[in-house]
Amino acid sequence: GNTGTLMVDRFLQTTDFILGIGTSFAISNFTAPMPPGVIKAQVTNVPEDLNRDNRVQYGAIGDARLVLQQLLEESKSQLGEHGRGDVHGVRDEIAEIKKEFMEEWGPRLNSNEIPMSPYRIFKEMMNAVDPRDCIVTHDSGYPRNQIVPFWPALKPRSYIGWGKSTQLGYGLGLALGAKIAAPEKIVINVMGDAAFGMAGMDIETASRSELGTITVVLNNGVMTHYYDHFPHATEHWKSNELGGNYTDTAKSLGAYGERVTSPDEIGSAMARAVEASKTGQPALLEMISKEEETISTYGR
């Protein structure tokens, strides 16, 4: 997406080496710019991606898993089975920068505003479930920009990120696939009301197939920031405005549905959605939120 964390930004500014795993190093609005003059190594299974947009000093063509295994084997042969440990205190440095980052965003993450702040919604979601037991994905647009810097990916395959494409509604399909692949997991997709308008009917697919996904819709009544893209249409025809009761829509399609208007309701609503999902019934939580344009643009 278009966002980044303070942690990534600080290390990009001070690093002397970057290892890209499974990346094209493409220059895009959706990727962090690489600092100039820094030695780079690239692992990719697409030969054409080597030196495509960014010059790399070391390249490895191969599957990321296999190359990483080879790197680990070579590291152990040089440094021993347990390596040399965190001799430079990098973990503590990351923790300190993260503390600074979270303090900066604390007012939004702890906001009691009504309509609700998306950041407070995400915080309450994280408190309501164990991210280790979940598979979470976002949608494109502002929901992605807002959740990416803050949702913790604590285990492999617990978070599905897709940052270089912008099709609205794609996250719902990803959630259905994830639930089929890992039915024991709590699968959550976060989408805006515009994204629901593009793909929301697939809630019926989840109901019919007994796929207990949880869809969190951030309903702020608009396509955020689109007045800048279509000022005339926005002024004369309100082309950026959206309306509807997505809770009732979900119920009519066989899902459990609940509308949430206050931050203190989120935890209990999430618990009820999880219980419904365990029976194979998809759940939709319609979060009445504010239009939030502030995003974390560190490293951009």
What is each PLM-predicted segment?
Residues D16, G22, L68-L79, K98-W105, ...:
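Structural signal for hydrophobic packing residues in well-ordered secondary-structure cores
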Residues E96-A178:
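Active-site diphosphate/adenylate-binding microenvironment
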Residues G1-E93, F230, A273:
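Glycine-rich, acidic loop regions that bind phosphate or pyrophosphate groups
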Residues V90-M102, L284-I295:
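A short, charged, Gly/Pro-tolerant segment at domain boundaries
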Residues D9-T15, N51-D53, G59-I61, R65-Q69, ...:
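Thiamine diphosphate
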Residues F25-A26, Y142-P143, V222:
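Alpha-helix capping/helix-boundary segments
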Residues G20, Q42, V136-H138, N189, ...:
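Structural beta-sheet core signal
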